Amino acid sequence: MSADTWDFWIDRGGTFTDIVARRPDGSLGTDKLLSENPEVYEDAALEAIRRFLGLSRDQPIPAARIGRIKMGTTVATNALLERKGAPTVLVTNAGLADQLRIAYQNRPELFAREIVLPEQLYARVIEATGRVRADGAEETPLDEARLRGDLEAVRAAGLESAAIVFIHGYRHHAMEARAGEIARAAGFAQVSVSHAVSPLMKMVSRGDTTVVDAYLSPILAAYVERIAAAFAGEARHKLMFMQSNGGLTDARLFQGKDAILSGPAGGVVGAAATSRIAGFEHIIGFDMGGTSTDVCHYAGAFERVLNTSISGVRVTAPMMDIHTVAAGGGSILHFDGTRLRVGPDSAGADPGPACYGRGGPLAVTDANVVTGRLRPEFFPAIFGPEAD
């Protein structure tokens, strides 16, 4: 920490953003804001930084006054839970269009009469003519002209991200790499190529992870750019994000596949550190936010997994062993005439639950207000049309 710079630790959730600031003199300050309040500020993290630095909302933040900003975010988590990622096309070999849908043929309810197929993150599939055998020999050359035409067509239809997954691509990736180049030339801002994202020999797990990366990375990139644009001077190198595995990474290296449990992973690290200070080595963590709830276990060491399923989506990447469900304080309450259903959609921070006074829907938080379980005196004055 420099003698004249500020450091910030930020937990940016789907509903609330919590901030800890270390002033140049070493003292600490905290703040809590709604993650989205467009009538008052553009972004909660930036608003908090400006408040601590004494800047108005239209003033750029001097990058020279910032030491480090370390952030955990549920931007990717909530985009996955609510299926609000970038429109994605899957590019794979001819004849393998249904490979990821068929997957391992697992059925969550073996004896159910109605078989409900899992929802896929990709909107379209392009079957590329071209194939490489397991020994690396080219069986069929890549039809570049046809692939280029197909990619340009789906790009014109509004798809923004491409996931390239070819058989044996984990080892022999020249054809995959060439397909990625064609996709970028066709105008796709985000191109996730399986041998770079998840170089694993099993095509299904490699493909699933690549699709997740393509689906979520544009959401993260847009958020990082929005943060960086608020600074006067280059600040990306000062911005770090928590990854799903509990470690920090430079904002410029933050990928969708590593961001799914960014916010929750920070909660696990924080809970473990807090429990050790209090003399506890064995804890169960319960982290209920506005959009999702996360449960973890800690017994003296962090528990990590390589393969996991989140909201019905399979991912193969190192991450904390956290169980996430789409149920939080902002989860919307639905009644279909026979039963009450909670979520998975959330009221978020804007408009938020009905009790926020912004015309939002009935949510879990409203039920807790009606039953008297929430005590207003413990909440900051950040609600309502005037955020007071």
Model segments located where?
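N-terminally biased helix-coil "hinge/interface" segments that flank
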Residues: 1-388
